[in-house]
Amino acid sequence: MNQRTTLYPLHAQLGAKLIPFAGYDMPVRYTGDKQEHMVVREGVGVFDVSHMGEFIIRGPKALALIQQISSNDASKLYPGKAQYGCMPNFEGGIVDDMIVYHIRHDQYMIVANAANIQKDWDWISASNEGIGAEMIDISDKTSLIAVAGPKADATLQKLAPEG
């Protein structure tokens, strides 16, 4: 049996077509591909991405580890901001893509692909051996949504204004 995200009951109640993906029962559509595509292109859409991996990297060595595993310069990443990039390997190939969030001073969160959670964790752990940052896998304890579309920012500002 596949795992289910925290939002699974809501997906089922709203009539989502659910399919197996990366060990989870995930919604693939509610009404129709074209209609849902246009809603996101012209308005705002919400996606359950709770099946993704989430790793906390923290402590005084956190930035050093992020710099070691990321194709981007995370020293330019301000708290509250994120970078999309990849984890390059030592041969110049790519281990996986990822999103790095700078949560606050000395704390970052990496979002990894659902199908590669263990592989990515192992790569980051091996890269951390000479660095010593604190690493915590919160994948099984975290729900995650993605909000996309040209009206996403305005919609989120209504829900969580700054200050």
Question: What is each PLM-predicted segment?
Answer:
Residues 1-163:
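Basic, glycine/lysine-rich polyanion-binding surfaces/domains
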